[in-house]
Amino acid sequence: MNYIELSVFIAYFVFMVAIGLYFFSKSKGAGEKDYFLGGRNMGAWVSALSAGASDMSAWVLMGLPASIYLSGMGQTWIAIGLGIGYAVSWIFMAPRLRRFSIAANDSITIPQYLTNRFLSKNRSLQILSAIIFLVAYTIYAASSIKACGTLFNTVMDIDPTVAMYIAAFIIVAYTFLGGFSAVCWTDFFQGMIMLAALLIAPLFALALAKAGDGAATGAALPEGFFNFFTTPQDIISGLGWGLGYFGMPHIIIRFMSLKSEKELRKSSVIGISWTTIILIMSALTAIAGRLYLGEIEDSSTVFITMVRRIFPALVSGLLLSAILSAAMSTADSQLLAASSAFASDVYKPVIRKKASDSEMLWAGRIVVIVIAVVALMIASDPNSGSIMGLVENAWGVFGAAFGPVILLSLFWKRLTFGGTVAGIAAGAAVDILWLVFLSSTDIYEIVPGFAAGLLAAVVVSLLSKGPGKDVEDLFDRAVDLKS
């Protein structure tokens, strides 16, 4: 066990909890919108890096480099798809979602927005969405907790299960205490750490490999490593990852939290730039790992192994905290999104219609703990699958279920309440069925799921009575809203 690296991790944990305590101290009198959406008062830098950090989980430091390290640059189609999807979501989707959520009775969650968009008192859409949120986010959070366990096991030789418990406790602590503001500010610092680590480590490794440093193996890249055009399935599936952004609640909720259109425009430039650099450097990490390390037993540890071999303990501890940053910044956002879905979309509408703001906050906090416990059970199960697999499954469900209907709700006036319910149900169902029965096709399930959700929403809307004039007026007001 390296006690210097351990000391860095402990200092990092203390800093994260301190942020949670700070915002908890400021939360007296805070309402539902403050805890779950930061009072719609977030600035450009914090929102941009929070959206990016909550998106780019430990997958970007472990999963993506591992895939490219093993299979070559053909796996970068995932990064290309994500980069395109992220840019499109910021440029075209973010301004409208912010306006529409305000016009739709100042909605603070995605299920709430989708219901209020149609001025409906029918809560079936809200409840269906919340159920999908709770299930998928529990699986997603498990991947982040599992990544923390892998890091501690590799670096500190601590039992992975014990490490997962420690990480889960810290994540729950500052999310439970500080809510959305604490999550966004911790994500901001975590995003800076991730950027620094991915800029420093692979460039140092490449320089050392080129210089023939004694630590380097002088390994050559495998034949065909730079073959981008592998199979049509790889390209379609990789680009299909970009569809997930249009339905990823814990990311797009940041669009709704910005305090003005001016801040949103600045945030989009910062966010797209940050993500582009992160994805490029993640791919470069795999190349650097091949050239500097040669063959290693566990490809998911290429970043960890490279950093520990190059840098002294204090520096490696700081750089490896990037993996903690990536995992924790995603997990905290997932826990908060799931808790807000329960508190705002199930607890108040169904269980306690007259619940006060204080009661709503505590309902959300309790759900943070419950989901974290279940996610911890999944993560600690040796049969739960890889980090990449867990992320892939949850990402697919969200993108297929919510992506089509959120896009249509922002750009198509003819969309109906029934069409939205049908789109969510069809997208989720086809995604899951494809995963279970047709995964052998090697087509990522989000692609057919997204297509099914889009088709169902359009067909059912066209076959049903159109939205009333009041719903159409809301659409027009939202388009013209300036704030």
Question: What residues fall within each predicted segment?
Answer:
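Membrane-embedded helix-loop-helix hairpins and adjacent transmembrane boundary segments
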Residues: M1-S483
